[in-house]
Design a protein with these regions (language model features):
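Short beta->alpha connector loops at strand-helix junctions that form conserved
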Residues: 28-29, 49, 71-72, 87-99, ...
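Rossmann-like adenosine-cofactor binding region
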Residues: 52-59, 171-267
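An N-terminal-biased, well-structured beta-alpha scaffold segment characteristic
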Residues: 1-91, 213-215
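NAD(P)-dependent dehydrogenase/reductase Rossmann-like domain
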Residues: 283-529
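Rossmann-like dinucleotide-binding domain for NAD(H)/NADP(H)
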Residues: 86, 90-91, 214, 223-342, ...
Length: 529
């Protein structure tokens, strides 16, 4: 079997592949898209980093392709949807850069506390200046960690070794996780107000974009030191620049930026109290070796019929089972995403119940698909079918799975319930319809609905009164948003009603505010499946 190594991975990883019986390894670093297309015609696996783009066209040109392995975390350079349609496994290596990124974060923190780079530059210029580079100690200072996932947890351990008090903000942080790491779980506002140092370790999503902005810097201590080795855009760069120039923020360390590469004329380059690195989070010999060997081992496992590990588009199952389970995996992932977006941030339990035919299948992969769907928008790390249960456990969320023997109105039904610490339940259920196994949402929060499980949804709870359908249609029409599908539900006339509207495009912020502000609308959620 032929493996194309399209980007340079560690020599140890390539050597491992070459040692496997029956494997032919082709190294083609820096190839043009046209060259890649010509090379993939007879390959069974492709190994990449971030340079080579594995597009739909590339996947279509590779009829024998079984697996794409990404030596690293992000898979933005791989068309995962096209790969999934073809039954091609896409894998990443999420754990290989944890220590490297945590240590780089701490390097930035130390350089922010003691201006070593600036002092070194002064020495290199021939000076002997002992007065300009006074710093502060980490000992007994307060560190605020925004995002207590895998990397944030490692940073917390190192900070405690330096004698720091550690605060953590993570909207999905369970008290048990905070206790295990011996950190104080606080709100974001409390963290910003109390911290001497802040480091961010969140994914970049709609919710985390600019989560630290002008308002944050107004609330922070004078002399704050702040660091970002996660994703550009979590800290608003214009706000940080202003805070650095005013002296409100004493120092910053940045490894990631809103736009990369960082512009040559960026104002950050001119500030003496900023240390910049060019996205080096995973750039250690050990991390590169780790992800290179890990991706090589994972590719070999797939080609040799072994376990599928760290798949981003399917669970650890064999290819034959994927064909049967595929529609259920898709439905489960979408139901998980739906419930996450209608439920509060912190939950204590996730209950998954299967009725009918689906309960006769191997439900473990489906359960993992549901968990991944729930986590993928909110986790501070890449979520796949392997690590989703681990992340739930780390968050302190109990997952209960039940195969029900009671009767259901459907041949098969999958229901997900998110239970909050105070016992509130937020739920959705779905089934597969027709010969093509089309996924449908049939219940939301106990109300009967019927809408395709795809695309963009408005989930509305409103007073049951005349004109509501027209009102919503008018608002969306003004916003040039087309309605693709709609389902209405109520328990009785005049009670609270549910309206689920599937739309072709995302409503503007103005339209959303108008909907949420309508007197008859009790709850309005915009959901992306």
């Amino acid at each position: 079997m032929k493996i194309l190594v399209a980007d340079k991975i560690s020599a140890k990883g390539v050597a491992f592949l070459r040692q496997q019986p029956g494997f032919e390894v082709v190294e083609a670093y820096g190839s043009s898209p046209e060259k890649i297309l010509s090379l993939v015609k007879d390959v069974h696996a492709i190994a990449v980093r971030s340079e080579t783009k594995i597009t739909r066209e590339v996947i279509a040109a590779a009829p024998l392709l079984k697996v794409v392995g990404r030596a690293g975390v992000g898979v933005d350079n791989v068309d995962v949807e096209a790969a999934t349609e073809r039954g091609v496994v896409v894998m990443n290596t999420p754990s290989g850069n944890t220590i490297a990124t945590a240590e780089l974060t701490f390097t930035h923190m130390l350089c922010g506390a003691r201006p070593v780079p600036q002092a070194a530059a002064s020495m290199a210029s021939g000076k002997w200046d002992r007065k300009s580079f006074s710093g502060v100690e980490l000992f007994r200072k307060t560190l605020g960690i925004v995002g207590l996932g895998r990397i944030g947890g490692e940073v917390a351990k190192r900070a405690q070794a330096f004698g720091m008090r550690v605060l953590a903000y993570d909207p999905y942080l369970a008290p048990s996780r905070a206790k295990a790491l011996q950190v104080e779980g606080v709100s974001l506002d409390e963290l910003i107000a109390q911290a001497d140092f802040i480091t961010v370790h969140m994914p970049l999503t709609e919710d985390t974009h600019y989560m630290i902005d002008e308002t944050s810097f107004e609330k922070c201590k004078k002399g704050l030191r702040i660091f970002n080795c996660a994703r550009g855009g979590i800290i608003k760069e214009s706000a940080l620049l202003a805070a650095l120039k005013s002296g409100k923020v004493a120092a910053a360390g940045l490894d990631v930026f809103e736009d990369e590469p960082l512009a040559a004329d960026s104002e950050f380059r001119k500030l003496p109290n900023v240390v910049l690195t060019p996205h080096l989070g995973a750039s250690t010999a050990e991390a590169q070796d780790a992800v290179g060997v890990e991706v090589a081992e994972q590719i070999a496992d797939v080609l040799n019929g072994g376990v599928i590990r760290n798949a981003v588009n399917m669970p650890s199952i064999d290819a034959a089972a994927v064909k049967v389970l595929g529609p259920y995996l898709d439905l489960g992932s979408k139901l998980g995403a739906l419930v996450q977006q209608i439920a509060p941030a912190q939950i204590a339990e996730l209950r998954i119940t299967y009725w009918g035919k689906v309960g006769e299948l191997d439900i473990n992969p489906i359960t993992r698909a549901i968990q991944r769907g729930y986590l993928r928008r909110i986790s501070g790390e890449e979520v796949n079918f392997v690590n989703a249960p681990v992340i739930f456990n780390r968050l302190g969320v109990r997952v209960e799975v039940v195969k029900s023997t009671t009767e259901s109105a459907y041949t098969d039904l999958t229901q997900i319930e998110a239970v909050t610490p105070d016992g509130q339940v937020f739920s959705a259920a779905g089934t597969l319809i027709g010969k093509n196994n089309n996924p449908r949402i049939v219940l939301i929060n106990g109300r009967d609905v019927d809408v395709a499980a795809e695309g963009k949804l408005l989930v509305l709870e409103n007073v049951d009164q005349p004109g509501m359908v027209g009102t919503i249609g008018t608002i969306l029409g003004k916003d040039k948003v087309n309605i693709a599908d709609m389902s209405l539900s109520r328990l009785s006339a005049g009670s609270t009603a549910y309206m689920v509207v599937r739309v072709d495009s995302e409503p503007s912020e103005t339209a959303r505010k108008e909907i949420k502000g309508h007197a008859a609308i009790k709850v309005a959620k915009f959901v992306q499946l």
